């Protein structure tokens, strides 16, 4: 299936790229960040070539759906770690059930269509900044507990040709502004 990407419109009706949408959102909410552009890096392996040695924890972001397809989860963790989906399912279930919420059930990667519908993104550009597009707050964000210890984090600005570096405290401010539910859990 082919997608027709429709550029975002900002308040003054000018066309903005996905990256500009993220950067403008952060500026409008007075959230400090640094940004740099580089050649396309759709995978961690590709992007590593272009990342600067800025001291940030570069994050891997995976988008899942439950077996019924009615719940969606974005999972973020340090890109230097790997996760088996079965282990991830167990940890997410444990976290949800401990809060009295229904289990996530069996997880699978969300399709590109679902990614576009809920985050406005394509594979290779997923990041927590996609939550800007989730105006109904459908997606729940799981962050690895170890990210709390990072002084700064880095993510794609919804475009795999750039990197945004943001302090952990300012990332927390972003999450409160965007309004989706989120929690920290131990993933590894």
Residue ranges and their predicted role:
Residues 3-188:
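Extended, low-hydrophobicity, polar/charged segments
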């Amino acid at each position: 299936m082919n997608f027709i990407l429709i550029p975002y419109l900002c308040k003054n009706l000018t066309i903005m790229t996905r990256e500009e949408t993220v950067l403008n959102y952060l500026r409008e909410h007075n959230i400090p960040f640094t940004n740099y552009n580089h050649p396309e890096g759709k995978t961690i392996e590709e992007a590593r070539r272009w990342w600067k040695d800025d001291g940030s924890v570069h994050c891997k972001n995976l988008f899942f759906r439950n077996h019924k397809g009615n719940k969606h989860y974005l999972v973020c963790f340090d890109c230097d770690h790997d996760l088996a989906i079965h282990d991830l399912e167990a940890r997410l279930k444990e976290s949800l059930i401990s809060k009295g919420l229904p289990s996530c059930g069996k997880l699978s990667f969300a399709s590109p269509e679902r990614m576009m519908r809920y985050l406005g993104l394509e594979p290779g550009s997923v990041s927590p900044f996609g939550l800007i597009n989730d105006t109904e707050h459908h997606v729940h964000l799981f962050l690895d507990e170890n990210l709390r210890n990072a002084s700064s984090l880095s993510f794609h600005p919804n475009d795999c040709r750039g990197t945004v570096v943001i302090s952990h405290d300012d990332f927390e401010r972003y999450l409160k502004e965007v309004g989706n539910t989120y929690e920290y859990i131990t993933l590894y």
